[in-house]
């Protein structure tokens, strides 16, 4: 995909700068940005940009048809389309169910010194921690299996990643039994796609200078 940099100044807001780029002075109404995806750093930045675009179009006596204005990781929602990706509540519930006290005692790489009583609160905290670790790995375009195969990783750490991969496999099976896809798997497979969704021809990174590697691979 072709890349082009645009440098903004310090005298106007980012929303005004980006709206001027998307709707230049020589553009003629009616305005349509349906084929453009704008990535913004926060939801609030997205709201300000939409307002700036609406005001700019209004000054030309028109409106503007918008494409997605989203934060970077919502790009995966576009790529996933109608795929049955599990939401965060389903993922959390299944991880909690998989991390039974009996299974946790078998995962001595992940839990070398588990508490005597692995109650709901402890298992819930452990599940959330592992979900967060997977999300951080996915941001770098990695999975636990990648670290198992990395010879530079300490063997003790490889044991931990091997345990995590084991739990991931069980979670994946449980999700599949309910007809769901693992969102991390969808992220990693989407990042490997060579082309963006056909409905969009332009992606604008507006004030997102430090995007995650997994997002960069998609663009």
Predicted regions and their residues:
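Conserved RecA-like helicase ATPase core segment
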Residues: 214-219
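Short glycine-enriched loop/turn motifs at secondary-structure junctions
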Residues: 31-32, 61
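Conserved phosphate-coordination/catalytic loops
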Residues: 8-16, 177-185, 209-210
């Amino acid at each position: 995909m072709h890349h082009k940099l645009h440098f903004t100044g310090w005298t106007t807001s980012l929303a005004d700068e980006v709206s001027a780029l998307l709707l230049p002075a020589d553009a003629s109404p009616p305005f349509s940005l349906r084929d453009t995806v704008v990535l913004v750093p926060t939801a609030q930045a997205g709201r300000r940009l939409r307002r700036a675009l609406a005001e700019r179009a209004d000054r030309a006596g028109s409106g503007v048809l918008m494409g997605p204005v989203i934060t970077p990781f919502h790009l995966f929602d576009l790529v996933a389309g109608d795929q049955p990706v599990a939401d965060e509540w389903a993922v959390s519930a299944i991880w909690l169910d998989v991390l039974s006290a009996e299974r946790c005692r078998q995962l001595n790489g992940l839990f070398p010194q588990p508490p005597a009583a692995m109650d709901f609160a402890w298992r819930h905290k452990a599940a959330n921690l592992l979900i967060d670790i997977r999300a951080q790995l996915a941001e770098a375009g990695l999975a636990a299996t990648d670290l198992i195969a990395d010879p530079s990783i300490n063997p003790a750490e490889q044991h931990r990643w091997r345990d995590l991969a084991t739990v991931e496999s069980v979670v994946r099976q449980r999700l599949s039994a309910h007809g769901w896809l693992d969102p991390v798997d969808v992220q990693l497979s989407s990042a490997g796609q060579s082309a963006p969704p056909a409905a969009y021809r332009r992606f604008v990174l507006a004030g997102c200078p430090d995007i995650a590697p997994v997002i960069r691979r998609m663009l």
